């Protein structure tokens, strides 16, 4: 009730409602609140009995596991919401108890620091090969950049090293037709590829669509790793019937060095459980990086 966008929307909805209801006393029966501030909830006209509370230390970008997740539960059903929580809980336990050399969030965290602080990478691409996850990168733009894009360490001293990367990305082959040119031929843009093994739409042309997506997923990561040297390029152009002059002219543009850093993250199927685990995985990765950088991943003074 103190966030400008949220309260503006709420007041607009209230105004629309009162055009028909005529009496503000009916707001109490037709609105519910998710808030930490009982006083402002009641001033708005909502019955405190219809207020779903959560702790005031829960930041927005980590709040979906709390009562704030009600909109998710209403959309997918509470049983599925519990599966989402269970997936996150599984990852919590993995993060808590697995030795660091096999700890997925820790490995992701130190790889990000290795690329960013030692190789000068300033971005991190999240590339889901499943349309159901098309907003995954956008979700973690806030999760990562608002958490670790910090100017000072915990004690208030100015940092003298890079902290959070710029997070970006698009799903599947959409990105291939937009920016893969850059990640193949320009260094220092680490990428996380993620994909389910099985599709929810396997009945479409006997699974052809997902087979194509998976083929692209595997081919892109292999190409980013191996690259293509001049000798291979020239051999391909010669086989295509190009003249020596054409090979000499075109060859340099088709060469790329490889050794581009990627992570391949796969799940059996995108479900509430696996999605919850993946979200928690990145949350713990962000936390781990914040600890190593000695910054507070849970404030956002730059926003405030």
From Swiss-Prot:
Molecular-function annotations in GO: carbohydrate derivative binding; glucose-6-phosphate isomerase activity; monosaccharide binding
Q: Which residues form a coiled coil?
A: none
Q: What is its EC number?
A: 5.3.1.9
Where is this gene product found? Cytoplasm
The entry's cellular-component GO terms read: cytosol
What is catalysed by this protein? alpha-D-glucose 6-phosphate = beta-D-fructose 6-phosphate
Kindly report the protein's main subcellular placement as a broad class.
cytoplasm
Q: Which PANTHER family match?
A: GLUCOSE-6-PHOSPHATE ISOMERASE
Example GO BP:
glycolytic process
What pathway does this protein act in? Carbohydrate degradation; glycolysis; D-glyceraldehyde 3-phosphate and glycerone phosphate from D-glucose: step 2/4
Q: What is this protein called?
A: Glucose-6-phosphate isomerase
Return the SUPFAM superfamilies for the record. Answer: SIS domain
The cross-references to InterPro entries, in alphabetical order and at most eight, read: G6P_Isomerase, Phosphoglucose_isomerase_CS, SIS_dom_sf, SIS_PGI_2
* Species of the source: Calanus finmarchicus
Q: Which keywords does this chain's UniProt record carry?
A: Cytoplasm, Gluconeogenesis, Glycolysis, Isomerase
Catalytic residues, per the record, are: 146 (proton donor), 177
Q: Tell me where on the tree of life, at the top rank, the source sits.
A: Eukaryota
In the record, the note on similarity to other proteins reads: Belongs to the GPI family.
- Alphabetical list of Pfam families matching this protein: PGI
């Amino acid at each position: 009730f103190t966030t400008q966008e949220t309260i503006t929307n709420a007041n607009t909805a209230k105004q629309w409602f009162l055009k028909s209801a005529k009496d503000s006393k009916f707001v109490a029966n037709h609105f519910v609140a998710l808030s930490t501030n009982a006083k402002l909830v009641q001033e708005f006209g909502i019955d405190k009995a219809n207020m779903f509370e959560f702790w005031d230390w829960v930041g927005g970008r980590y709040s979906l596991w709390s009562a704030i997740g009600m909109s998710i539960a209403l959309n997918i059903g509470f049983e599925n919401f519990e599966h989402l929580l269970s997936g996150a809980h599984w990852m919590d336990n993995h993060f808590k108890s697995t030795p660091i050399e096999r700890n997925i969030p820790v490995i992701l965290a130190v790889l990000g620091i290795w690329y960013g602080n030692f190789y000068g990478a300033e971005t991190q691409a999240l590339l889901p090969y499943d349309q159901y996850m098309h907003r995954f990168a956008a979700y973690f733009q806030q999760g990562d950049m608002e958490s670790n894009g910090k100017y000072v360490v915990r004690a208030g001293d100015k940092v003298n090293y890079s902290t959070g990367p710029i997070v970006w990305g698009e799903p599947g082959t959409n990105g291939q037709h937009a920016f893969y040119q850059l990640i193949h031929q320009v260094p220092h843009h680490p990428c996380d590829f993620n994909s389910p093994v099985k599709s929810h739409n396997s009945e479409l042309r006997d699974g052809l669509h997902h087979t194509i997506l998976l083929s692209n997923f595997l081919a892109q990561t292999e190409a980013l790793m191996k690259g293509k040297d001049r000798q291979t390029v020239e051999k391909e152009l010669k086989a295509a019937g190009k003249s020596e002059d054409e090979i000499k002219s075109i060859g340099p543009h088709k060469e790329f060095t490889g050794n581009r850093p990627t992570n391949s993250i796969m799940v059996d199927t995108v479900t509430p459980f696996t999605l919850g685990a993946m979200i928690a995985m990145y949350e713990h990765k962000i936390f781990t990086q914040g600890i190593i950088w000695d910054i507070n991943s849970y404030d956002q003074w730059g926003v405030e």
